[in-house]
UniProtKB/Swiss-Prot annotation:
This is NADH-quinone oxidoreductase subunit A. The keyword Chaperone does not apply. It comes from Aeromonas salmonicida (strain A449). It catalyses: a quinone + NADH + 5 H(+)(in) = a quinol + NAD(+) + 4 H(+)(out). It is found in: Cell inner membrane. Pfam families: Oxidored_q4 (PF00507). The keyword Lyase does not apply.
Amino acid sequence: MFADIAVQHWAFAIYVIAAICLCLVMIGLAALLGGRAHGRAKNTPFESGVDSVGNARLRFSAKFYLVAMFFVIFDVEALYLFAWSVSVRESGWVGFIEAAIFIGLLLVGLLYLWRIGALDSAPKKRALTDKKPD
């Protein structure tokens, strides 16, 4: 059984072995030919000739993660709609109605997120009720 598999996939095995050997050769040559300058300046990050200031670990707002999630959601939507558009003739009116329902549900979800303020990246304004009385 192993002999049958080996006969059928010998070209792929040679390709994998060649790719691994090529990677090992490139890593080995980089280690042999690369510079080895060590010093205090080598341990600092390079920022286009400007001395680095502050900590590199910055806190990101949760809004950035929300934008990333929206991107993934609508990217998957585009993937499904692309697959539908390729087979639109075979799916007929039933496929069109299903795609319209899918797009409608996504639009309802988008309108809901817009309505609750999930798409607003600016901070909310303070209410005018916090004023001091004169």
